[in-house]
């Protein structure tokens, strides 16, 4: 019996349970946001990864779930009725499911890019109406509330919210995993691969796609409700296109072809955004570059790369991959350093603040501060640094791809099986060339 599918998730949950003991208050809040983003990505992957329905408007159900939770919390706060705080995500999921059925009924009448455009239009409709409907969405300022005590917990400290979020994340992840093994879950895969054949076999593909989409929206609503509980507020920006775009990018970066890949990608990119947004205004540019690089060199995503290595690399094969991957890391560090230096330098000299300094200096190019040092904008040395880093990184990249290709052949045993010494393209990392 293969225990890996049980042991690995159990170890992951155990780590998450013990994590708050080692985190600061700021990192604990970040961990809550990362788990919510991971659940959002898992819910989105049900529609996109399993059923092939690329939605550009999933933020609509994320926001609806959040506002459902907020209105219940407001009602509890006003003592209109009692509703246990740990069960509030059920309301978010219910609202997400209902609107997923209604909106999905219209959207799933079309496929491919037309489906994506319909979902985007419906989300933009809510995004436009939300600031106008003050009673429901609180206009531009949104609605603020407080978490109420339930079941002996106050849900005031962040660690209690962390464990509540963790419980819902684990439960929802298990439900999504189990759904993939139900007849409807198997039908979702068939719809993705060949919808015409499924229709020929007698299935009502429109109804099936609507149900699958609604279930995806259900768990998206749960994620939105958890966000509302953790933030104790919400505004119309929850429906914004940035939330819909983020979950798409995070899913592809994590790897839509694996189950936990999107969750991993969402957690990593949420943490990346939280850290870099405090350091630079160019963090969105870096996030976009990461997406482009992943699509170019790892189109299967981070989860796909891990899965590929777990399947293909033989026992002891990791030894021959250590050196190629170390060279690849050095190459990546050099390229990142060159790109960051260039971007931050350009961002600094093109700002209004720097332009004001030039005006004060009567048009002269004054030195600018970067990484604790002073640089002259017109000095050849200033621009030689990033160019040298990029050139050296580019040279090492060519060497790294060759080393990875050869190491991959040895690690997987393909060199012995193929007399030409070449591995099939689908059996090696995309960045490697034979």
Where does each model-flagged region fall?
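Transmembrane alpha-helices and adjacent helix-loop boundaries
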Residues: 1-434
């Amino acid at each position: 019996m293969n225990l890996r599918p049980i042991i690995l998730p159990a170890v992951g949950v155990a780590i998450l349970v013990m994590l708050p003991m080692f985190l600061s208050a700021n990192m604990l809040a970040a961990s809550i946001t990362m788990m919510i983003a991971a659940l959002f990505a898992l819910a989105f992957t049900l529609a996109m990864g399993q059923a092939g329905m690329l939605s550009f408007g999933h933020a609509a159900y994320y926001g609806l779930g959040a506002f459902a939770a907020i209105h219940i919390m407001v009602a509890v706060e006003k003592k209109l009725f009692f509703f246990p705080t740990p069960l509030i995500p059920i309301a978010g999921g219910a609202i997400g499911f209902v609107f997923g059925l209604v909106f999905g009924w219209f959207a799933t009448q079309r496929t491919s890019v037309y489906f994506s455009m319909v979902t985007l239009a419906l989300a933009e409709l809510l995004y436009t109406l939300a600031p106008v409907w003050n009673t429901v969405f609180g206009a531009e300022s949104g609605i603020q509330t407080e978490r109420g005590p339930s079941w002996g917990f106050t849900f005031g400290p962040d660690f209690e919210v962390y464990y509540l979020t963790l419980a819902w994340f684990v439960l929802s992840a298990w439900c999504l995993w189990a759904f993939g093994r139900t007849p409807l879950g198997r039908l979702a895969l068939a719809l993705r691969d060949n919808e015409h054949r499924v229709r020929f076999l007698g299935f009502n593909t429109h109804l099936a796609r609507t149900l699958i989409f609604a279930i995806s929206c259900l768990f998206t609503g749960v994620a939105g409700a958890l966000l509302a509980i953790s933030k104790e507020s919400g505004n119309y920006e929850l429906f914004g296109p940035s939330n819909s775009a983020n979950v798409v990018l995070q899913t592809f970066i994590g790897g839509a072809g694996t189950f936990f890949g999107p969750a991993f990608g969402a957690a990593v990119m949420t943490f990346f955004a939280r850290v870099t947004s405090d350091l630079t205004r160019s963090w969105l540019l870096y996030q976009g570059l990461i997406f482009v690089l992943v699509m170019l060199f790892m189109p299967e995503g981070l989860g796909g790369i891990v899965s590929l290595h777990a399947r293909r690399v033989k026992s002891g094969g990791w030894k021959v991959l250590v050196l190629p991957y170390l060279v690849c890391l050095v190459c990546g560090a050099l390229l990142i350093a060159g790109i960051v230096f260039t971007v931050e330098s350009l961002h600094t000299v093109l700002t209004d603040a720097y332009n004001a300094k030039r005006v004060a200096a009567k048009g002269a190019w004054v030195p600018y501060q970067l990484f604790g040092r002073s640089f002259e904008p017109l000095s050849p040395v200033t621009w030689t640094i990033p160019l040298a880093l990029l050139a050296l990184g580019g040279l090492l990249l060519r060497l790294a791809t060759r080393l990875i290709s050869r190491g991959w052949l040895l690690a997987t045993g393909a060199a012995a099986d193929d007399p030409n010494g070449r591995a099939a393209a689908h059996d090696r990392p995309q960045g490697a060339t034979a």
